[in-house]
Design a protein with these regions (language model features):
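Acidic, low-complexity proline/glycine-rich segments
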Residues: 6-18
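Soluble acyl-CoA-dependent acyltransferase catalytic core bearing the H(X)4D motif
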Residues: 1-8, 26-39, 45-429, 433-464, ...
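TRNA-binding/sensing appendages of the translation machinery
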Residues: 18-23, 42
């Protein structure tokens, strides 16, 4: 039995009827090298039965205490049933990429049941006739609650449930033995001890405690405007966009793939640019084109909240969430793609420098000192207030670079070829762009809700247009002095079949 950390619990408390704190990973497999892949629900059940032991998240569930007077506990699920967690859905016989994206949206829209372990796998076989995908393609949708994993720990679990070349067969799972929950008196005592410790830490954070102030106080206390803006520009506000309004329970999702080698080559066009800067530039261009299409492009540049992993090596095995965020100016007001890349390179560098180690962990420190009952009340209040405000407060949308596998992975005989990500959105923050890499491919996935993004395919087209714009401009500009990467040929994206 393990108690949730304050940061993990926050993802539970933020949930409501329209906001669900889970992510859905979209794994696409190439089974064209197999004569009979044997891709069906029974095979997936057998495979997962042999991998349940790789992480406790597969067999434990959440136990919340009365009135949320302390943080919830992870407890073993004595009635665990694997059949509940492994499912299968199929596309229509003539289904295309748009139909597949709609299926992902539907699966992602359904909340996870807290009476069970917080994960599901959904098999989607026979994606054989979708342009741009292998002739023997299938997908697995892995839905996991954010209370259990973040991007870094999630990739560890993904690699553990897949097969890798030369990997030994996994050991069998030991029987589940439920742990005893603490009594009401024990829970009250633990909550009291925790709150006393949180009070001391809170006093320390505001400078009233006995502990010495850190050397990098200046960084930790840098106001948000300084962190989010260029060092040579006046801070600007957060524009209100069509993405910043109340969401509905029905999710929408779209994803497009690009050649990672070409993206790496684009950074040569601007001195100091990183791959992440190139990706942010492509995303910003896509958003600019889409908002122009909707006649809703703001004059003030949009801001993106970018999650960052802040766990140390010693904390790497702890699981759960240890994340913070930096906020970066996306410069959506700049039409020229190379000028936009230059501006984003400066902005991202300034944001990273100002958000030092202590500054990045400050969100985690603040969450740690808020008692469980207050967190639960605040989480409910935030959702209601944001739903009525219909406006952004800190940033316009999230852009997250999720780590990809470092080796070739297989499942049910298929080689993992591509990874997409459907991510959670909430009232006031109705856009989440996930960036994932796998097997030399970079995939840009866009998550929103149906009332905000009724035409996700159009936003996907705009991302492709932005990629082509930047690629063309980068080729015409002499490369800066750094080790070059030979551009590869652009990959074709899955497209809708013509009727």
């Amino acid at each position: 039995m393990q108690q949730l950390t304050p940061m993990d619990a926050a993802f539970l408390y933020l949930e409501n009827e329209s906001t669900h704190a889970h992510g859905t990973l979209v794994w696409l497999y190439d089974a064209s090298h197999c004569e009979d892949p044997g891709v069906n629900r029974r095979a997936l059940l057998e495979h997962m039965r042999s991998r349940l032991h790789v992480s406790p998240i597969f067999t434990r569930k959440i136990h919340r205490l009365p009135l949320d007077f302390d943080y919830p506990y992870w407890v073993d699920d004595a009635g665990f049933e694997l059949l509940y967690h492994v499912r299968e859905l199929s596309l229509p016989q003539d289904g295309d990429w748009g139909d597949f994206c709609q299926l992902v949206s539907t699966v992602h829209s359904r909340p996870l049941d807290h009476n069970h372990p917080l994960w599901e796998l959904t098999l989607v076989p026979k994606l054989n006739d979708i342009d741009g995908l292998p002739p023997q393609c299938f997908a697995i949708l892995g839905k996991f609650h954010h209370v259990a994993i973040d991007g870094a720990t999630g990739m560890q679990i993904i690699e553990a449930i897949h097969d890798a070349p030369g990997q030994q067969q996994a050991e069998a799972l030991a029987p589940v033995r439920p742990a005893r929950l603490p009594s009401l008196g024990e829970s009250l005592f633990r909550a009291a001890i925790r709150n006393v410790g949180a009070l001391d830490k809170g006093l320390e954070l505001v400078g009233l405690g006995a502990s010495p102030r850190p050397d990098n106080t200046e960084i930790a206390e840098a106001p948000l405007e300084e962190v989010t803006s260029d060092p040579h520009q006046e801070p600007s506000g957060i524009p209100q966009t069509l993405f910043n309004q109340a969401i509905t329970p029905q999710a929408t999702w779209e994803s497009r793939s690009f050649d990672l080698a070409r993206i790496k080559a684009m950074r040569q066009a601007v001195k100091g640019a990183t791959v992440n800067d190139v990706l942010l530039t492509i995303v910003a261009g896509g958003l600019r084109h889409y908002l122009q299409h909707r006649e809703a492009l703001p004059d003030t540049p949009m801001k993106a909240g970018c999650p960052v992993n802040i766990r140390t090596e010693a904390e790497a095995a702890a699981g759960g969430n240890m994340i913070s965020a930096i906020i970066i100016n996306m410069h959506t007001d700049i039409a020229d793609p190379l000028q936009r890349l230059q501006a984003i390179t400066r902005s991202s560098s300034a944001a990273k420098q100002r958000a030092g180690a202590r500054g990045s962990r400050k969100i985690l420190d603040v969450v740690d000192v808020v008692p469980a009952q207050a967190q639960a009340l605040l989480g409910n209040l935030v959702g209601k207030v944001a739903g009525k405000m219909n406006r952004a407060v800190q940033f316009n949308g999230s852009v997250s670079n999720l780590p990809g596998p470092q080796q070739e992975l297989h499942m049910l005989g298929g080689r993992l070829q591509s990874i997409g990500a459907a991510m959670p959105v909430m009232n006031g923050y109705g856009l989440f762009v996930g960036l994932t890499t796998c097997a030399g491919e970079l995939r840009i996935s866009m998550s929103s809700s149906a009332n905000i993004l009724p035409d996700p395919g159009k936003l996907g087209d705009c991302m492709e247009h932005s990629f082509k714009e930047l690629s063309s401009a980068a080729r015409k500009r002499p490369a800066t002095k750094r080790k070059s990467t030979k551009p590869g040929a652009a990959k074709s994206r899955p497209t809708r079949k013509k009727s």
